[in-house]
């Protein structure tokens, strides 16, 4: 069976007696390459796809190369299309990214799998875990994510649970996944099952791709985990042994390209997923239990600014934000939660005009304490609210959500200081901080 091939490519491969898994050679005056014949997902009927010795897949147009059959390969085992699935249902909601995408090799473009059948074909192991359904909500780069898209994702998650899903997997690009995780955590509470955000650091055509393992472990997590909260599930180390489920309001992408880039900050992961053993190992008992009756409040005010203080930053930036109609500022201050003393009057004016101003730390690890030094105490007198160990991005999203619920400044302050879904960790331990080796 020559899956996906048609037209000129199908005609040529059929004439050679080639099948998926056979070793072919393509050549012309400039190049000679051999590789294993792979299924095609190309729209160009002249393209054949080979997996090269380096592990990468490449497409070749039969209009530009000659093709010969070098040896017959091992036939891939066919999986039944009509097998009895295990009880339980997991909904996969795709928003973009490479996690459930296929590569069109003639252009290099990546397109999402567009149906449940395509996702199962992409990662057939998920059939062994549970029955799934899939929805392509939209397909965007994660840097193009906006609060209005968070609303659509939240509504889709609520709809999935209303339709009987036991857990939901949200496929998402990795760059802004932690923002979306926080947005879902605040806007959908009392969850009846896990909401698992998952992405891929390496595209599916690369030999080191993490997409298959991440998706398999996320489906397993969505079905088996006892908690009812939003988590991010990604590789737990650089090898392929396990993934870690991080609480959605305590996680951050800490490396540009490593497969284990996502780390819990000031917190421990909730669970470890041993995907080969099909086992979910719960690491803590303080998780939010599954609940009945989802509470959906997906309203966000995006006139909120994340202000990173640096030496020389002028306080008139606060007045610019005030005159531009912003309703809140999250400050990413230095150390225990500081800016220069120049900002005291500017923040006082902002608070007087009804803006919420909250303080987080650039250090990420540890918590804000604005009572230690005079600068912090004076900033508090100006109306700046210390936000403990909340991550700057999480504080930003929470303030967007809080302002979407109420315009009363005191109520916003109450919401921001209330530990709703584990965004504050009241107890820190030594092993919350990564100690780098220098030997």
UniProtKB/Swiss-Prot annotation:
EC number, UniProt record: 6.3.5.-
A single GO BP: amino acid metabolic process
Positions of the catalytic residues: 98, 174-175, 253
Keyword DNA damage: no
Domain Asparaginase/glutaminase: 88-419
UniProt KW keywords: ATP-binding, Ligase, Nucleotide-binding, Protein biosynthesis
Alphabetical list of InterPro entries matching this protein: AsnA_fam, Asp/glu_Ase-like_sf, Asparaginase/glutaminase-like, Asparaginase/glutaminase_AS2, Asparaginase_C, GatD, GatD_N, GatD_N_sf
Catalysed reactions, semicolon-separated: L-glutamyl-tRNA(Gln) + L-glutamine + ATP + H2O = L-glutaminyl-tRNA(Gln) + L-glutamate + ADP + phosphate + H(+)
Gene3D superfamilies: 2.30.30.520, 3.40.50.40, L-asparaginase, N-terminal domain (3.40.50.1170)
CDD domains: GatD
Source domain of life: Archaea
Cross-referenced PROSITE patterns: ASN_GLN_ASE_2, ASN_GLN_ASE_3
Molecular function GO terms recorded: asparaginase activity; ATP binding; glutaminyl-tRNA synthase (glutamine-hydrolyzing) activity
SMART domains reported in the protein's UniProt record: Asparaginase
Subunit structure, interactors included: Heterodimer of GatD and GatE.
Alphabetical list of HAMAP family matching this protein: GatD (MF_00586)
Free-text function comment from the UniProt entry: Allows the formation of correctly charged Gln-tRNA(Gln) through the transamidation of misacylated Glu-tRNA(Gln) in organisms which lack glutaminyl-tRNA synthetase. The reaction takes place in the presence of glutamine and ATP through an activated gamma-phospho-Glu-tRNA(Gln). The GatDE system is specific for glutamate and does not act on aspartate.
Family per record: Belongs to the asparaginase 1 family. GatD subfamily.
Identification of the protein by name: Glutamyl-tRNA(Gln) amidotransferase subunit D
Organism whose genome encodes this protein: Metallosphaera sedula (strain ATCC 51363 / DSM 5348 / JCM 9185 / NBRC 15509 / TH2)
């Amino acid at each position: 069976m020559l899956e996906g091939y048609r037209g000129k490519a199908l005609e040529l491969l059929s004439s050679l007696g080639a099948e998926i898994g056979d070793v072919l050679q393509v050549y012309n005056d400039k190049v000679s390459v051999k590789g294993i014949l792979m299924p095609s997902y190309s729209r160009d009927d002249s393209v054949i796809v080979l997996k090269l010795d380096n592990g990468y897949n490449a497409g070749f147009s039969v209009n530009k190369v000659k093709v010969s059959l070098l040896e017959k390969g091992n036939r891939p085992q066919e999986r039944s299309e009509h097998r009895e699935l295990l009880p339980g249902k997991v909904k996969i909601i795709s928003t973009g990214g490479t996690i459930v995408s296929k590569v069109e090799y003639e252009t290099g473009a990546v397109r999402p799998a567009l149906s449940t059948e395509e996702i199962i074909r992409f990662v057939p192991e998920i059939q062994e875990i549970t029955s799934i359904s899939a929805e392509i909500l939209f397909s965007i780069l994660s840097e193009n994510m906006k609060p209005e898209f968070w609303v659509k994702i939240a509504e889709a998650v609520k709809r999935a649970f209303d339709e009987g899903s036991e857990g939901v997997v949200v496929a998402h690009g990795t760059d802004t996944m932690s923002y979306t995780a926080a947005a879902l955590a605040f806007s959908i509470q009392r969850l009846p099952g896990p909401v698992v955000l998952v992405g891929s650091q390496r595209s599916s055509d690369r030999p080191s791709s993490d997409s298959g393992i991440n998706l398999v472990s996320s489906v397993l997590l969505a079905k088996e985990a006892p908690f009812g909260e939003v988590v991010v599930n990604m590789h737990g180390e650089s090898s392929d042994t396990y993934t870690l489920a991080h609480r959605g309001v305590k996680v951050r992408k800490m490396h540009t390209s490593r497969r284990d880039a996502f780390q819990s900050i000031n917190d421990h992961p909730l669970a470890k997923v041993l995907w080969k053993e099909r086992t979910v190992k719960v690491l803590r008992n303080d998780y939010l239990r599954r609940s009945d009756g989802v509470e959906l409040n997906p309203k966000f005010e995006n006139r909120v600014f994340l202000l990173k203080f640096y030496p020389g930053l002028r306080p008139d930036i606060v007045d610019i934000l005030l005159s531009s109609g912003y309703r809140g500022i999250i400050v990413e201050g230095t150390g225990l939660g500081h800016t220069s003393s120049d900002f005291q009057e500017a923040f006082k004016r902002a608070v007087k005009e009804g803006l919420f101003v909250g303080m987080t730390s650039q250090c990420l690890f540890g918590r804000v304490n604005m009572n230690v030094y005079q600068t912090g105490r004076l900033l508090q007198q100006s109306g700046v609210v210390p936000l403990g160990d909340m991550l700057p991005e999480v504080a930003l999203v929470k303030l967007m959500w809080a302002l979407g619920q109420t315009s009363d400044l005191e109520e916003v302050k109450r919401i921001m200081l209330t530990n709703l879904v584990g965004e504050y960790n009241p107890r820190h331990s030594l092993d919350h901080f990564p100690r780098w080796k220098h030997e």
